[in-house]
Structure formats: C-alpha cells, structure tokens
C-alpha cells in the first residue's frame, strides 16, 4: 500500500531542450496528463526536500516515452541545465482514484516475488524497480544470487498481484530466470 503522506516519483528530468528553458522528462507514470496539463508540480534534487513549481505547458515527443515541458521561471537553456537529474513528484494523497482490482505500478516496488513450484509457493526475490520505456517490466532481484532479472508485466507471466499481502506471483517462461 502507498503511504498517503509520501511522494511518488512520476518523472525524471533527463536534459534540456532548446534555448527557451524547456526540459526533457522521462515518464515513470501511466498518466500522461501529469506532463501535459498546466498546474503545480513538485521538483526534487537528490537529497533535498521537494519544492513547488508550476508546469506551464508540455507535449509528448512523437514515437517516444518522453515529454518536453516548460516550467515557470525556467527561461533559458542554462536554467534548464540546472534541473538535469531532478525528479518530478506528486503527493500520494493526490493520486488518481482506481477501481477495486487496479493499483498504481509504483505500488509493486518492494513486493515479494513468488513462483508456484510443485503446488507450493516459493519466494524467489523482490521487485526492486520498474522499467517502462515501451512495455512495463518488473526489475526483480533474485535472493539466491542477487541477480537482477527483467520480467514483462503481462497477465500471462504475472498472473497475480496481491498488494494487500505484499507479493506477486510470476509464471516465467523456461530459462527466463537463468538469463
């Protein structure tokens, strides 16, 4: 479960764009309006508290999972360059309401990963991150060797997500965990 008094990283500023202070944002969110719709946002530099900033405008780059956004007070390329590696955050109490069986992808981080072997559930690792360039992938750290494995987040491979009990069950194709 997401703590209602915390922050959720929904984007990462990766670079500046042009000469008028626009920044390129890698989305970590399924909700594009977070980078398109004007309004207040929060920026965070590593190891510093979040600060409020207004998003003036934004658009999605054609064929990519990145957005170009204009932020209040960021008017030059040098201003934009200072924001490289900043995170864009939302408060968890401002998350969109979901239906009963839905969840936010970021809720998957730190869930235990289990497989069904010989009719028994076996814990094999935990979800340590997500990758969502084109398709959602779970980044799983295996307990037996600390290897990181990418698991496609599709119903056939991840048939059960239990947010309440903090685990997912995966049914990986043969050899996927040995890569």
UniProtKB/Swiss-Prot annotation:
SUPFAM superfamilies: PRC-barrel domain (SSF50346), Translation proteins (SSF50447). Signal peptide: none annotated. Pfam families: PRC_RimM (PF24986), RimM (PF01782). It comes from Prochlorococcus marinus (strain MIT 9301). GO terms for cellular component: cytoplasm; ribosome. The keyword rRNA processing applies. Its main location: cytoplasm. GO terms for molecular function: ribosome binding. One of its GO terms (biological process) is rRNA processing. Residues 100-176 form the PRC barrel domain. It is found in: Cytoplasm. NCBIfam families: 16S_RimM. Binds ribosomal protein uS19. An accessory protein needed during the final step in the assembly of 30S ribosomal subunit, possibly for assembly of the head region. Essential for efficient processing of 16S rRNA. May be needed both before and after RbfA during the maturation of 16S rRNA. It has affinity for free ribosomal 30S subunits but not for 70S ribosomes. Belongs to the RimM family. This is Ribosome maturation factor RimM. Keywords: Chaperone, Cytoplasm, Ribosome biogenesis, rRNA processing. The lineage of its organism: Bacteria, Bacillati, Cyanobacteriota, Cyanophyceae, Synechococcales. The keyword Cytoplasm applies.
